Amino acid sequence: FPAFNSPDLKSQCFFENAGGSYASKQVIDKLMQFYTHHKVQPYSPFPAAEKAGIAMDKSLELISGMLNVASSTIHFGPSTSQNSYTLAQALRESNPSKRTIIVTNQDHEANTGVWRRLEKSGFVIREWRVNPETGALSTDDLNTLLDDTVNLVAFPHCSNIVAYENPVVEICR
């Protein structure tokens, strides 16, 4: 992380969110390569575009291998906030019998706001509340919120609000 060599950041701890995180040298190098050699529409029939497409395909293969999922299930977008907004807009047209979304109060507005705003489109928003003593989410509490009308449960893997890592596998069962 080259930024931490600068005098303003040297010897500092940085606990910012993903949108404000500093990039590693490897990411900076790849971005520099992209901006200087392949900043074109990928997959077009000329060398720079072909190389851009190959680089995108390689990144999908690497990520799919890390996550142990098919590369066809991975989609890149400009930011988590924009991706969530796009997904929320698509959900607006979803099955009318599945109009309930569960969000937590363990998250911040950037993660729950897109879902909460769907209430204006007729969705029911249920809040899965943390234990006020521990900051943890209880799967027992979640089970009381679940029914056949639930379309989505949105929760953080790690909450930077209460410094808690949620048991994702247990929650998703």
Whereabouts are the PLM-identified features?
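Pyridoxal 5′-phosphate
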Residues: 1-173
